Amino acid sequence: MSESTYPSVKDLTLEEKASLTSGGDAWHLQGVESKGIPSYMITDGPHGLRKSLASSAGETDLDDSVPATCFPPAAGLSSSWNPELIHKVGEAMAEECIQEKVAVILGPGVNIKRNPLGGRCFEYWSEDPYLAGHEAIGIVEGVQSKGVGTSLKHFAANNQETDRLRVDARISPRALREIYFPAFEHIVKKAQPWTIMCSYNRINGVHSAQNHWLLTDVLRDEWGFDGIVMSDWGADHDRGASLNAGLNLEMPPSYTDDQIVYAVRDGLITPAQLDRMAQGMIDLVNKTRAAMSIDNYRFDVDAHDEVAHQAAIESIVMLKNDDAILPLNAGPVANPSATPQKIAVIGEFARTPRYQGGGSSHITPTKMTSFLDTLAERGIKADFAPGFTLDLEPADPALESEAVETAKNADVVLMFLGLPEAVESEGFDRDTLDMPAKQIALLEQVAAANQNVVVVLSNGSVITVAPWAKNAKGILESWLLGQSGGPALADVIFGQVSPSGKLAQSIPLDINDDPSMLNWPGEEGHVDYGEGVFAGYRYYDTYGKAVDYPFGYGLSYATFEITGVAVAKTGANTATVTATVTNTSDVDAAETVQVYVVPGKADVARPKHELKGFTKAFLKAGESKTVAIDLDERAFAYWSEKYNDWHVEAGEYAIEVGVSSRDIADTVAVALDGDGKTQPLTEWSTYGEWEADPFGAKIVAAVAAAGEAGELTKLPDNAMMRMFLNPMPINSLPTLLGEGGKKIAQFMLDEYAKLSK
C-alpha cells in the first residue's frame, strides 16, 4: 500500500469510525483490517520497552516481559543534563520497538516532581519544567526519528500516587502555565509527539479525559498539537464526553462502541467530531507503517548496553568528596605501578542492584551486571558483606557484625545503601524521606570501625542525607542506573571517568521544608497546590531556605572556571548569553553551564530566579570553550491572569551564569522593552493603574492641569492622601472628594474613550 492509497475516514462506516476510538485489547489499537487499517501494538516505556509476554493475547502482566535494554529511569537520566545522550537512548528504544513490532512506546513522563515523596518520581524528570522539557524531548525525537511513536504523559498534573485515579488537583492558572504545562508545551511545539496520554486525575474539578479546555483549547488550538490523545489505562469514564473533549482513544477498551454510534445518531456527538478523532487514529497508523513493515529486524544488544552504560555514567551525581577520597586506586588493574587499596564493599545493593522503579515500567533487562560482578570481571579484589536485607524486616545482628569486621580490615569502605522497591513504586507515595533506619544504624557502626567510608545511594527520588552524612567522606547519588549501573559505578569510583551528573531535584534538609507539604497529599478527594509557582528551588532560593544540596549541584574530579560572561540583546525581549568555561585541572571532565533569569520589578510575585538555559561542555584537561545560550521572550515572561497570556514587563533583568542554583559565577544585566501589553482602563481601575498606563498617564496629567486651572477639584498632593488615592478605584473618588471626585472620575472615563479610539 502506497501513501497515496492509505485509507481515509471517508472510506469508513459509522461503526468502523467508532471502533477506531477504542483499543482492540489491552495492548493493541483496534484496526479495520478490511479497509487496510492494522491493529498495531502499543506498550509501556518509559525507560525501555516493556512488552508483556501476555500482550500478544491482549492480557496484562507487569512481571513477565520480553528482554529489552533497561536504560536509567528519568530520575537518573535527568541528572545527565545531556539532551544529545538522551536522544541516543530514544533511538535505541525505537530499534527495540521495531524488533518487537511495537508501534508506540508509552513515554516519556514529564510530570513535575512537586514533592519528593511522590511514588512515581523515579520516572519523572525534574522539579523544573524547563529542564524536564529540554531533556525529555530527546526521548521523543530519538524514538520518532526511527518511525516509532511516543506517548507524552501524563497530561496533566499527575504529581502524586495517593488517590491518583480521582483526586482533584486544584491549581491556579498561573501555576499550571508556569510549572505544570511547560514541559508538555515545549515538546509539543518542538517535536510533535505522535500521541499524548491524559492523566487519571481531575484538574479544577474536571477529569483530564473529559476536559475540553485541556485537550482541545490548550493542547490543540493554542499549542498546535496534531497527534492523538489516548487515555491512561481506565481513565476514560464517559466515552461520549471524552470524545467531544478531544480524546481520540480510550485504553483499554470498554467494548462500548455502540454508545458512540448511538450518540452520533442522537446528535450528542457531531459526525465531524467523530471524523476528526477517527482520522487521527488513521494518521497514527500511517505514521508507523514503515517501521512496522520491517521484518526480521534484530537490534544490537551489546551496542544498546553500551548506550545504557554511558547513560548511567552521566546519571551519577557526586555529592561529597572530602579528602579527595575518590577516585579509588584499583592497583595494577588500572595502573601497573600503583599499590592497590584494600577495599571492602558493604550493602546488598552491590550484589542485588535496584536498577529501575516498580509498576508499569518494570523491564526484563537483556543483561544485568552488578557492581560486584564488575569487580570480578575487571579483576579488582574486594571483600564483601551484605550488611542488611532488602526487605522491611528488622536489622540482622549477624549481618551487621560481619559487615563491621569486614570494614575494620579495609583501607576504604564502599557502602551501597538506599531504598528497597517495597517503599518506592508506582501506586503509592512514600511516607518518609529518610533512608531505612537499619541502614543508617549499620553506617554508623561501620564508620566507627573505619573512617574512610564512601556511600553509594540507590533510590528513585531524593532521600535526606544530612542526618548521616558525617559518617561518610564520599557520597555518590546513583539513583536507579538501569542494567549497566555496575560498570558505570566502577568507572566513576576508580577514576576511568569523572562524575558529571547534576541534581535535577533539590535535596531538602527535611521533608517539612518542602513548600507542598502544607497540602500534601490532600484531603477529601482534592489537593490544593497552595505553593503556586514556588515549587522546588523556586521556593527554597526565593525565601532563603537552607537545603542540603541545591538544584543543579554536582561535584567533579576536575575543577572549572567560568569567565567572560556577557549578554547581548537580539530583539526587544530576547538575548544571547555567552561565557567561557575552562577546565583548570589535569583531569578530562564535563561541566554544565546553567543560566538563570532574575526578574526585575514585577506586578506579581515571581521566584528569585528560574533556569532558562544550560549546556554541557566536555573539556580536556586545561581546555576552554565558549558557550552561547539563547534566551527567547518566554525566558523572561510570566503568565498573567490579568491578560490571560504570557507577559514580559519592561525593565532591567539580571542573567546569572553558574553551576547550580546557588553557585553563580557571574551576573550581568539586560534591559528589555517589554511586550507593551496593557489592559483597558475602567471605573474599577485604580488611580495608580491610570498613572501607570500610557493613555491613563496623559489623562492624569490633564486632571492635574484642570485642577490648577480651577476647572476640576484639585487632587490632594500630600503623601498621606496619595497613599489612600493610589490604590483606590476611580469610582471611589467621591468618597474622598465628594461631588468633585465624581466629576473627576467621569472626566477621566470620557477622555479615555476619546484617546483609546
Swiss-Prot record:
Keywords: Carbohydrate metabolism, Glycosidase, Hydrolase. It is an enzyme of class 3 (hydrolase). The active site is at 232. Optimum pH is 6.8. GO terms for molecular function: hydrolase activity, hydrolyzing O-glycosyl compounds. SUPFAM superfamilies: (Trans)glycosidases, Beta-D-glucan exohydrolase, C-terminal domain. Its EC number is 3.2.1.-. SMART domains: Fn3_like (SM01217). Optimum temperature is 48 degrees Celsius. Catalyzes the hydrolysis of a non-reducing terminal alpha-L-arabinopyranosidic linkage in ginsenoside Rb2 (alpha-L-arabinopyranosyl-(1->6)-alpha-D-glucopyranosyl) to release alpha-D-glucopyranosyl (Rd). It is not able to hydrolyze alpha-L-arabinofuranosyl-(1->6)-alpha-D-glucopyranosyl (Rc). Homotetramer. Belongs to the glycosyl hydrolase 3 family. This is Exo-alpha-(1->6)-L-arabinopyranosidase. It comes from Bifidobacterium longum. The lineage of its organism: Bacteria, Bacillati, Actinomycetota, Actinomycetes, Bifidobacteriales. The gene is apy.
